[in-house]
């Protein structure tokens, strides 16, 4: 027996080792994927990053998870596509240009180069040949062509619309980008503005997007529910209210036509055409409308604002009773882009309507009575709460006595019979406004001609490339200020015309990048059809849940549109989805309330936290998501430089399931580092038989550890299939603890130790790939471990040879014992009666009867 030859020295040189194996993988081109029709494919993808210049711990976790999956699937025999790229357009580059006097393109490309090296230092198994950057004309020329094809297909249109305007970023935000009335990036209070915008017709796919959620069985239920709620299908009626003293009508959508007899008012949006008409002759109303327009257009902004209304003096005629009129208010809580921009209010059965009615003294009428408690509505309203539950219609003429669903159906039938409306379906989902008033984005390929109108840029003139000679010394869009770029001849009539100066929302680029990876070298087409048909859909997508109704929904729509325009043959982009949790760290504040970096805090002599330089007391706060604003961040580069990529990867996998938040702790990273070194020492110091030596007779202890080894192989494979990475790590640790307990000087134990260390190297390969390669080399493994197959467990060793048997005294559990499977009943009885707990429970009395149920129970009757 001898020690392995592949390891020298008395400590693990992590920097040299990791760099060496990264070079070896690159030289061997281990991770370059090609179409292989006879091999099962597996496409694993993590959401690509914005190139800010430095990776953060969230990146480390996200990309580690994806890399474990990619390496494991390769070992299982799959043809794995695992690419990486850059979501490279966006406002931060423009902000950097303003602050640092550097061009966005230069800033972005330098950041990409820096982050590429950081990602490579993690040992990630990417096919770097397929790298894309969305800011390059070679990429966005294809999305300009897609836009023109969508335009031909009727999926694009332009209209004036009220938009969410971010006054800090000077651009339009989609509703999904407005959070609690503020811009999702700047945090500025969002305003309403009327602008001419380009829209993608996502609503054309609303029902299919909703129905197909049921097919996404490998998506988290939470994400599917979020998309279902965002699409927001509601069945109801479109009602036509006559306007008292006028010949026109007001259209109202409602999901509760059964409550019409409880109506007390009508409310219209501040940007409703009727509101604009009435405000033209009413200065007070005009001021109220202007106040409403200073709010954001999203539901979040409206829900958080105080509910206000303005009585226009106009009245609407009740559709079931021409003698009954309702006051019409302009209200700040009515959305113009939901339904028809007008509602009727039934205060007794809608909380918002009740609050509004109470504020303006409009009263209420109960029209639904709970079957179980006739006083429930009165009791609720007395507490300021509307009753929104089921029941039967009351005070509703021909609807009285009908259950709510029956009353809805009957109300709609009468409305249709009278010609005052119809049954309809409405969606909360709005068409996607993709126009952005900024420079660093993909130019929209359209020309505006006074003679010809809106003209698509001819395909042969694509791409429309951003000008490089721009300045950022004025607010707003530099393309608007450019002296020459926007001036162009009309491709139809040849007269002077103007380019569209808006650029695409950056979610446009991320809505199709995953398909571009299948053939990024094709310059003539966005996707090679053979490659796209082979690789798509993405088998496993990994990213944050914050993208549930932004990127993920847009990508589902975009893929459908591409399919309908002949680009792809799939309509769902991501077959499986894993949403990882956040990385959290304790927060720290100085005496004056300023946030402190973790590196600025140390334990004092008394164990309490103090400032590292001044010694001043520091207050430790709760663990929160790592963020620059609270300074509770840890630089991955420092961790990788000090501990190595494998240690960082192991920590990311060890302590929490991937979908949960992970608390970063120094103790945790130190523990991971100790385990890395422990594995290295186990191999470096092991006295092992030659590779391939026949198995000698094993002692019971060695046989027990070998059985644990093979169970671990089987269980770790199952854990990785289910993304239970923390469980896999725990099982490997338990198994290597067992290997460490094998007795020295025992040939059978040494043989099991070699088998165990070889299997350990292969099991940790997806998680700690550099250490795994080093162990594999030292143990005499053939070739690169990155190309080796996953270990297989011996089925015979997975069969339990012992069972846990419960021992009862007079039917009460007193002990459990380990017995050989199918043991003789006499031995089972003898072992049970010898247990101290059983002897105590028998209190010196003889056993009158002992019942043995094989492999399950021994029951002693006294």
Swiss-Prot record:
It is found in: Cytoplasm. Signal peptide: none annotated. GO terms for cellular component: cytosol. One of its GO terms (biological process) is leucyl-tRNA aminoacylation. It comes from the Bacteria. GO terms for molecular function: aminoacyl-tRNA deacylase activity; ATP binding; leucine-tRNA ligase activity. InterPro entries: aa-tRNA-synth_I_CS (IPR001412), aa-tRNA-synth_Ia (IPR002300), Leu-tRNA-ligase (IPR002302), Leu_tRNA-synth_edit (IPR025709), M/V/L/I-tRNA-synth_anticd-bd (IPR013155), Methionyl/Leucyl_tRNA_Synth (IPR015413), Rossmann-like_a/b/a_fold (IPR014729), tRNAsynth_Ia_anticodon-bd (IPR009080). Its EC number is 6.1.1.4. It is an enzyme of class 6 (ligase). It catalyses: tRNA(Leu) + L-leucine + ATP = L-leucyl-tRNA(Leu) + AMP + diphosphate. A motif ('HIGH' region) lies at residues 49-59. Pfam families: Anticodon_1, tRNA-synt_1, tRNA-synt_1_2, tRNA-synt_1g. ATP binds at residue 628. SUPFAM superfamilies: Anticodon-binding domain of a subclass of class I aminoacyl-tRNA synthetases, Nucleotidylyl transferase, ValRS/IleRS/LeuRS editing domain. A motif ('KMSKS' region) lies at residues 625-629. Keywords: Aminoacyl-tRNA synthetase, ATP-binding, Cytoplasm, Ligase, Nucleotide-binding, Protein biosynthesis. Belongs to the class-I aminoacyl-tRNA synthetase family. This is Leucine--tRNA ligase. It comes from Paramagnetospirillum magneticum (strain ATCC 700264 / AMB-1) (Magnetospirillum magneticum). The lineage of its organism: Bacteria, Pseudomonadati, Pseudomonadota, Alphaproteobacteria, Rhodospirillales. The gene is leuS.
């Amino acid at each position: 027996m001898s020690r392995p030859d592949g390891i020298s020295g008395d400590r693990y040189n992590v920097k040299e080792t990791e760099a060496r194996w990264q070079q070896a993988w690159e030289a061997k081109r281990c991770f370059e994927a090609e179409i292989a029709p006879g091999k099962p494919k597996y496409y694993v993808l993590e959401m690509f990053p914005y190139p800010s210049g430095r990776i953060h711990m969230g990146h480390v976790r996200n990309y580690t998870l994806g890399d474990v999956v990619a390496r494991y699937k390769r070992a299982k025999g799959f043809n794995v596509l695992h690419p990486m790229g850059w979501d490279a357009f966006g406002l931060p580059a423009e902000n950097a240009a303003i602050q640092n006097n550097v061009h966005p393109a230069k800033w972005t490309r330098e950041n990409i180069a820096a982050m590429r090296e950081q990602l490579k230092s993690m040992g990630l198994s990417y096919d770097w040949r397929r790298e894309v950057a969305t800011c390059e004309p070679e990429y966005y020329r294809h999305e300009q062509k897609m836009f023109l094809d969508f335009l031909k297909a009727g999926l694009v249109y332009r209209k004036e619309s009220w938009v969410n305007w971010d006054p800090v970023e000077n651009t339009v935000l989609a509703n999904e980008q407005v959070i609690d009335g503020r811009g999702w990036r700047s945090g500025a209070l969002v305003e309403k503005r009327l602008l001419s915008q380009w829209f993608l017709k996502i609503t054309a796919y609303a029902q299919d997007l909703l129905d197909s959620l049921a097919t996404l069985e490998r998506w988290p239920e939470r994400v599917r529910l979020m998309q279902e709620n965002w699409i927001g299908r509601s069945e109801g009626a479109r009602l036509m209210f006559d306007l008292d003293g006028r010949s026109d009508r007001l259209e109202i959508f409602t999901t509760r036509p059964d409550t019409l007899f409880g109506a007390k008012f009508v409310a219209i949006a501040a940007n409703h055409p009727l509101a604009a008409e009435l405000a033209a002759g009413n200065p007070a109303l005009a001021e109220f409308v202007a106040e409403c327009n200073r709010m954001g257009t999203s539901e979040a902004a409206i829900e958080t604002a105080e509910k206000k209304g303005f009585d226009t003096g106009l009245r609407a005629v009740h559709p079931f009773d021409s003698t009954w009129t309702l006051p019409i208010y302009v209200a700040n809580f009515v959305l113009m882009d939901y339904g028809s921009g007008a509602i009727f209010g039934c205060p007794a059965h809608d909380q918002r309507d009740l609050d509004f009615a109470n504020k303006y003294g409009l009263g209420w009428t109960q029209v639904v009575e709970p079957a179980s408690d006739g006083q429930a509505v009165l009791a609720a309203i007395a507490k300021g709460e509307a009753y929104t539950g089921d029941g039967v219609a009351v005070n509703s003429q021909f609807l009285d006595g009908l259950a709510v669903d029956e009353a809805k159906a009957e109300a709609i039938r009468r409305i249709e019979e009278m010609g005052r409306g119809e049954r309809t379906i409405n969606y909360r989902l709005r068409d996607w406004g993709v126009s952005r008033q900024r420079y660093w984005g993909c130019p929209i390929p359209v020309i505006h001609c006074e003679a010809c109108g809106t003209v698509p840029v001819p395909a042969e003139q694509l791409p429309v490339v951003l000008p490089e000679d721009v300045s950022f010394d004025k607010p707003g869009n530099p393309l608007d200020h450019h002296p020459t770029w926007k001036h162009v001849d009309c491709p139809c009539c040849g007269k002077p015309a103007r380019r569209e100066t808006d650029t695409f929302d950056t979610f446009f680029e991320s809505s199709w990048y995953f398909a571009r990876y299948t053939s990024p070298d094709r310059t003539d087409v966005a996707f090679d059809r053979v490659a796209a048909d082979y690789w798509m859909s993405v088998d496993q997508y990994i990213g944050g849940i914050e993208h549930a109704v932004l990127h993920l929904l847009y990508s589902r729509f975009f893929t459908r549109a591409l399919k309908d325009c002949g680009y792809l043959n799939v309509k769902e982009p991501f077959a499986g989805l894993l949403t990882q949790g956040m990385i959290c760290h304790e927060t720290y504040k100085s005496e004056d309330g300023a946030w402190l970096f973790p590196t600025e805090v140390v334990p004092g002599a008394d164990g309490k936290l103090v400032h590292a330089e001044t010694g001043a007391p520091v207050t430790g706060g709760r663990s929160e998501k790592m963020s620059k604003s609270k300074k509770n961040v840890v630089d991955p580069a420092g961790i990788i430089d000090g501990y190595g990529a494998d240690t960082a990867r192991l920590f990311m996998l060890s302590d929490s399931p991937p979908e949960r938040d992970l608390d970063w702790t120094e103790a945790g990273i130190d523990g991971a580092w100790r385990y890395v070194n422990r594995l290295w020492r186990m191999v470096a110091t092991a006295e092992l038989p030659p590779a391939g030596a026949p198995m000698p007779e094993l002692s019971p202890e060695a046989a027990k550890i070998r059985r644990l080894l093979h169970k671990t192989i089987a269980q770790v494979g199952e854990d990785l299939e289910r993304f239970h990475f923390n469980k896999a790590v725990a099982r490997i640790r338990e198994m290597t603890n067992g290997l460490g307990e094998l007795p020295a000087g025992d040939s059978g134990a040494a043989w099991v130790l070699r088998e165990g260390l070889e299997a350990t190297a292969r099991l940790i390969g997806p998680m700690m790939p550099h250490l795994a390669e080093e162990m594999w080399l030292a143990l005499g493994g053939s070739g690169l471990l990155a190309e080796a197959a996953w270990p297989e467990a011996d089925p015979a060793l997975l069969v339990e040879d012992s069972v846990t048997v419960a021992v009862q005294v007079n039917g009460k559990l007193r002990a459990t014992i380990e017995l050989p499977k199918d043991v003789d009943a006499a031995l089972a009885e003898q072992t049970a009666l010898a247990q101290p707990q059983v002897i105590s429970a028998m209190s010196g009395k003889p056993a009158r009867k002992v019942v043995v149920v094989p492999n399950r129970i021994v029951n002693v009757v006294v």
